Amino acid sequence: EAFATRAFDRVFPGDTTWSAVRFLGLEQSNSSVVLNEQALIKLFRRIEDGDNPDFAVSLHLTEHTGFTALAPVAGGIRLERDGRTAALAMLQPYLASDGDGWQFALDSAAAFAAARHEQPEAQWRPFAGMDLFTAAAAWPTIEAPAWCGDDLAAFAALGARTAELHLALASD
């Protein structure tokens, strides 16, 4: 069964005759197809009875919460056989990006390590005599802004989105 969600017309208000098709070459656990640089079909490689967790959670957030910090589910394909259902694919808007979260984290960690390596030992003196938890609580105001630079704002935004996600998931 192929179906559109209530979000379909909002997500794709115009012509949905997609003729340009390309496969994403990224290493991931699913196969993804991009349509006219507007839509993404995520094909689940592991097919099991019941909904795929990625599909089920994304669909719930799209249809039952106000959480907007993820690509909404516009449709899907389910296989129904012998009274059992399995999710095969999900349709979402295609959101181009300059990279992925894992690479961002690796780059940030490398930059942090390089900055720490270049700092003289005197930079650590404000933490002398502090227990680990007190130092961790004080670190953001003493050193984090200088060492993390713009990444600190990205980490704060990630934390805020994660908190919003958990609130949305708990809202049911």
PLM segments and residue spans:
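Conserved ATP-binding subdomain of kinase catalytic cores across diverse folds
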Residues: 1-172
